[in-house]
């Protein structure tokens, strides 16, 4: 894709997660969606060509203490969301976001023997922390995810010796740490360090073929910012001279195995 997908300004939706990545972000978890056009700034990532889409999760210091919503459709799509944020004291806040959904009914409205849409089970749990002490601000987040999708022939159409079935199983864990320190508020002199990591594991079956894959990602972004003049009322107006410098590091490690059922794996 030419558009870089970010969560909390970290390149979280990439590689193996790109196929269903946006579905791993439940709507009730979103605090804001930020869209930019054109090539990206190195401040938030250098991989975008046509633009960036950044999703901000609910913040524990501003979200409701508890919020619950649940739904079920006529086609047995059931979903529940629980979110909550609490101020532990005047410096520390924490929040929990939970999502679960299940679609277990086999739908074949055109009666061709294949599922119109995959059966799906998804469980998603996130915990984040916010710390503010003096000139230091820190944010910490960890999330775990399980997702299963089943498609192919319906039960009524599986009389064949080798019925075509699709079974996608995904386990994922990711998280980040954001640390920022302000040295001079008048000049806007500060340093920010973002680190994130993720592990994504997929075990998939497509008929008589299996494709298993795992991805490990590590990301580091460190930015130093300052202004050369404290006379303006707005540190970032058009008449102010500012400096932003830093470094960015991104690592992806992949491990894949493809085989026919009963054969040795090809890695």
Where does each model-flagged region fall?
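Transmembrane beta-barrel strands of outer-membrane/channel proteins
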Residues: 68-72, 96-102, 140-146, 193-199, ...
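Short loop/turn motifs that connect adjacent beta-strands in outer-membrane beta-barrel proteins
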Residues: 44, 60-65, 90-92, 134-137, ...
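Flexible loop and strand-edge segments within Gram-negative outer membrane beta-barrel domains
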Residues: 103-126, 130-191, 197-217
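Short acidic/polar hinge/loop motifs at secondary-structure boundaries
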Residues: 10-37
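Transmembrane beta-barrel domains of outer membrane proteins
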Residues: 36, 56, 83-87, 97, ...
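Signature of Gram-negative outer-membrane beta-barrel scaffolds
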Residues: 236-267
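Extracytoplasmic beta-strand/coil segments of soluble accessory domains associated
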Residues: 1-11
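Short strand-turn segments of transmembrane beta-barrel domains in outer membranes
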Residues: 34, 39-41, 52, 57-86, ...
């Amino acid at each position: 894709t030419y558009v870089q997908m970010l969560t909390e300004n970290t390149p979280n939706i990439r590689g193996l997660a790109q196929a269903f990545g946006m579905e791993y972000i439940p709507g009730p978890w979103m605090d804001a969606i930020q869209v930019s056009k054109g090539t990206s700034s190195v401040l938030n990532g250098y991989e975008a060509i046509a633009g960036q889409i950044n999703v901000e999760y609910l913040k524990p210091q501003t979200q409701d203490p508890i919020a619950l919503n649940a739904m079920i459709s006529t086609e047995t799509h059931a979903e529940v969301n629980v979110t909550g944020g609490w101020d532990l004291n005047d410096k520390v806040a924490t929040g929990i976001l939970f999502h679960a959904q299940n679609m277990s009914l086999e739908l074949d409205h055109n009666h061709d023997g294949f599922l119109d849409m995959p059966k799906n089970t998804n469980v998603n749990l996130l915990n984040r922390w916010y710390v503010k002490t003096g000139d230091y601000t820190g944010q910490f987040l960890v999330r775990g995810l399980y997702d299963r999708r089943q498609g192919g022939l319906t039960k009524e159409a599986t009389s064949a010796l080798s019925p075509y079935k699709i079974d996608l199983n995904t386990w994922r864990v990711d998280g980040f740490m954001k640390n920022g320190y302000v040295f001079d508020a008048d000049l806007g002199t500060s340093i920010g360090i973002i680190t994130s990591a993720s592990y994504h594991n997929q075990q998939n079956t497509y008929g008589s073929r299996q494709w298993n894959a795992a991805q490990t990602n590590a990301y580091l972004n460190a930015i130093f910012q300052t202004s050369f003049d404290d006379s303006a009322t707005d540190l970032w107006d058009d008449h102010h001279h500012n400096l932003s410098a830093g470094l960015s590091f991104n690592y992806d490690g992949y491990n894949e195995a493809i085989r026919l059922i009963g054969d040795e794996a090809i890695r």
